Amino acid sequence: MVKEIILASKSGVRKKILEENNIQFRVEPSNVDEDSVKESLLKEKVTPTIISKNLAELKANKISQKFTEEIVLGADSVIDLEGKIISKPNDREEALEILKRMNGKTHQLISSVCISRGGSMIWNYTDKASLTMKNMTFLELENYLKKISDKDLYAYNVYQIEGEGRNLFSKIEGDEDTIMGLPVKKIKEYLKIIK
């Protein structure tokens, strides 16, 4: 089993998941320009799943080229609402608009992970969760946004599923770690067998 991995992300949520699962790691952010990569892939009309996979691989490979002997973990999550990707909000006004678009609808949250060594992918995994948002009033949506911090708002794709965000949904199907952006059970399985 690998003693330590490199997390190619500065995501506080992903760091927390790894810590809670006793996975030894250090952080080397990839600083990939996700928006331009997404924009380019959307022009090619690829699916949200492919976008998530490609971004996770790009992040892992970029850092893996720098630290060739080490195991590097890249991850990415994408929200697919009716075939359209929902990006993280830049401010509370955008967050409210996103929540209004999701209101009463089901969306898919796609989380991909990639493990690379020597600049190339050696393993990847993608998982999906399906979340159905309650029909909520404008006031309820505004009140929800008032309850969460700016940090949580931007880090969790508008909703913090392990906190206040759970109250937004009438139905949640899928693994909570996937919804939080890191399907850690599969990562742990793979790390047990890798040399």
Curated annotation (Swiss-Prot):
Keyword set includes Cytoplasm: yes
Cofactor: a divalent metal cation
Keywords: Cytoplasm, Hydrolase, Nucleotide metabolism
Top enzyme category: hydrolase
One BP annotation, GO: nucleotide metabolic process
Enzyme active site: D76 (proton acceptor)
UniProt keyword Ribonucleoprotein present: no
EC number of this enzyme: 3.6.1.9
Localization of this protein: Cytoplasm
GO cellular component: cytoplasm
Catalytic activity: a ribonucleoside 5'-triphosphate + H2O = a ribonucleoside 5'-phosphate + diphosphate + H(+); a 2'-deoxyribonucleoside 5'-triphosphate + H2O = a 2'-deoxyribonucleoside 5'-phosphate + diphosphate + H(+)
Gene Ontology terms for molecular function: nucleoside triphosphate diphosphatase activity
CDD domains per record: Maf (cd00555)
Family: Belongs to the Maf family.
Purpose of the protein: Nucleoside triphosphate pyrophosphatase. May have a dual role in cell division arrest and in preventing the incorporation of modified nucleotides into cellular nucleic acids.
Protein name (record): Nucleoside triphosphate pyrophosphatase
Species assigned in the record: Pelagibacter ubique (strain HTCC1062)
